[in-house]
Regions:
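Short, small-residue-biased leader/transition segments that mark boundaries at the very start
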Residues: 1-5
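C-terminal regulatory/interaction module of P-loop NTP-utilizing enzymes
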Residues: 7-180
């Protein structure tokens, strides 16, 4: 989250990452419809939603089945988690994103920050081998990192617009990959 906030008379500051897991009834799983109605009212406030970077559509992730289980040699999950933990502290990926992403003038700062953080996360997961901006295939970065990050943030904006008219018909800024 990494933000300063005020809630119900409490001032706070956060630099932690948070993941909310939950089930939304199948009939409500429509990003273009209001999905948050069955959640606690705290999660139906635009101020909190604005601090959530993106929404992962769980219904697009295949259900676990026997065909997805591995046999034989595999990557140890504890080792993999250790790698991810180390990558979390590696700021070089964010520096790469800063160098290759172009932000339009007057773009909303919170949207821009959310998209950049999500794109950085995708970069770490999908292209952990990159060490500088010259190692990045710009088209792959756009297709696999930046575009999905913007889609994840767009769902948040759509949900905000269904709660408060201030956010209605507002889209995320169109971040682009710099050509050079």
């Amino acid at each position: 989250l990494g933000d300063v906030y005020k809630r119900q008379g409490y001032n706070g500051e956060s630099d932690a990452g948070v993941v909310f897991l939950g089930n939304i009834k199948e009939e409500n799983m429509d990003e273009y419809g209001y999905m948050l109605g069955e959640l606690p009212t705290l999660f139906q406030e635009t101020a909190l939603l604005d601090r959530i970077h993106g929404f992962v559509k769980g219904w697009d992730i295949p259900r676990m089945n026997d065909g997805l289980k591995l046999t034989g040699w595999a990557l140890n999950s504890e080792y993999f988690c250790s790698i991810l933990h180390e990558l979390r502290n590696d700021m070089s990926y964010r520096a790469i994103v800063e160098k290759i992403v172009e932000v339009p003038k007057h773009a909303d700062t919170r949207d821009t920050e959310a998209i950049k953080r999500l794109a950085t996360a995708y970069l770490k997961l999908l292209f952990p081998n990159v060490r500088n901006e010259f190692d990045v295939d710009k088209m792959e970065f756009r297709d696999y990192c930046l575009t999905p990050a913007m889609k994840m943030r767009r769902i948040i904006k759509l949900q905000q617009g269904m709660i408060d008219s201030e956010y209605k018909n507002k889209d995320v800024p169109c971040l682009m990959v710099r050509e050079k």
